Every structure is written in structure tokens, then in C-alpha cells.
């Protein structure tokens, strides 16, 4: 069962759930909390590699990822990031989220953006129990026109679901947690699998 708005506010009030900066009451509705777009992005430089062999030797995968991912792009307050049709980019939420060991989060993109062709979170919309950090967004423009994305715009909504018991292996205590504490648009670390 997912938390309703009153429960989300109660979990925020008593510190079991942390969203920084704390969202104002008008951004908590029904069963979700709106999240905004941060100012950090990464893009793929497709011309730098013919392909990535995802099941190849780890070192080769790491080298290919290093070639195809841009350095992090940080936008100023009034700047826009343009996502062109058919392009994939990584971005990050403005908010940092900390989940307790007995709560899982779910991120959904906004329907209004999807209707323009913007996929906000292509896959992996689960936020694990014990998560701490910003949430990396996997943008894809499936529309016909370039889309201007600006830091601070509403980009998605989080919902939360209590677990039957605290997780035995929450994300923040796992040795193999590849994205622990991320604050920027962290590129794929599939080579760490």
C-alpha cells in the first residue's frame, strides 16, 4: 500500500523520510511528491564508438563508456538544455532523497511531458530502501521537436510504499551499490556488475 499525502508529510515531519530541500505542501498531492529538474546533465557522444559490447570484458566496457559519455554539463540558472528527437541524455533531480530501510520509492514522469514525447525515466524507476542521493533521470525525446529543459521545472513525481519489514540489504549498506550517494548525472557503471 502506498503512502498518502498525510502519511508522506508525517514521515517527513518525523524524519523517517528525507527530501532535501523539503517540498512545500502544494507539491505533495494524493500519493505523490513532485520533484524538479536539477542543473546537471550528461549526453552520449555516439560518434566516438561503433558499439558497446555490454557482455564483453569489463575493462573494454569501461573504456567504451568513457569514450561515449560526455563530461558532466552544469547549467546556469537561466540556461536550457535542449534534447533533440531520438536523443538520450542523463540528468538529475534537484532534490536529494533519503529512504529508510523499510520504504521503497517509485519515480514516474509527468503525463504532460510524455504527451510531448519526453520520457523522463526510461527504466529502473524503483528507488531502493536505504537510498541516499539525487535521482538520475534517463531522458529520451521520442517526439518530433527539440525540447528545452530548464533547471527547476517540475519533472516527475515520487510515491512511496512501506515494506513488510526493514530490508536486510538496504542500498546504503550494500558493498556492490554502484550509485551510492550520487549527486550528479552519474553515467552507467555496468562495467561494475
UniProtKB/Swiss-Prot annotation:
GO terms for biological process: dUMP biosynthetic process; dUTP biosynthetic process; nucleobase-containing small molecule interconversion. Its EC number is 3.5.4.13. The keyword rRNA processing does not apply. It is an enzyme of class 3 (hydrolase). The active site is at residue 138. It catalyses: dCTP + H2O + H(+) = dUTP + NH4(+). DCTP binds at residues 110-115, 128, 136-138, 171, 178, 182. GO terms for molecular function: dCTP deaminase activity; nucleotide binding. Pathway: Pyrimidine metabolism; dUMP biosynthesis; dUMP from dCTP (dUTP route): step 1/2. Keywords: Hydrolase, Nucleotide metabolism, Nucleotide-binding. Pfam families: DCD. Residues 171-193 are annotated as: Disordered. Homotrimer. PANTHER family: DCTP DEAMINASE (PTHR42680:SF3). Catalyzes the deamination of dCTP to dUTP. HAMAP family: dCTP_deaminase. Belongs to the dCTP deaminase family. This is dCTP deaminase.
Amino acid at each position: 500500500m502506498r503512502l498518502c499525502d498525510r502519511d508522506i508529510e508525517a514521515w517527513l515531519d518525523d524524519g523517517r523520510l528525507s527530501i532535501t530541500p523539503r517540498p512545500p505542501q502544494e507539491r505533495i498531492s494524493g500519493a505523490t511528491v513532485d520533484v524538479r529538474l536539477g542543473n546537471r546533465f550528461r549526453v552520449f557522444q555516439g560518434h566516438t564508438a561503433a558499439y558497446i559490447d555490454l557482455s564483453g570484458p569489463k575493462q573494454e566496457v569501461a573504456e567504451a563508456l568513457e569514450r561515449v559519455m560526455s563530461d558532466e554539463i552544469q547549467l546556469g540558472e537561466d540556461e536550457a538544455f535542449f534534447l533533440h528527437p531520438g536523443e538520450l541524455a542523463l540528468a538529475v533531480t534537484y532534490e536529494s532523497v533519503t529512504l529508510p530501510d523499510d520504504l521503497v520509492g517509485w519515480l514516474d514522469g509527468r503525463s504532460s511531458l510524455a504527451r510531448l514525447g519526453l520520457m523522463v525515466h526510461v527504466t529502473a524507476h524503483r528507488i531502493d530502501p536505504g537510498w541516499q542521493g539525487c535521482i538520475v533521470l534517463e531522458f529520451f525525446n521520442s517526439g518530433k521537436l527539440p525540447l528545452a529543459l530548464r533547471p527547476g521545472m517540475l519533472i516527475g513525481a515520487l510515491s512511496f510504499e512501506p515494506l513488510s519489514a526493514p530490508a536486510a540489504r538496504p542500498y546504503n549498506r550494500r558493498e556492490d551499490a554502484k550509485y551510492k550517494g550520487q549527486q550528479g548525472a552519474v553515467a552507467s557503471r555496468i562495467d561494475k556488475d
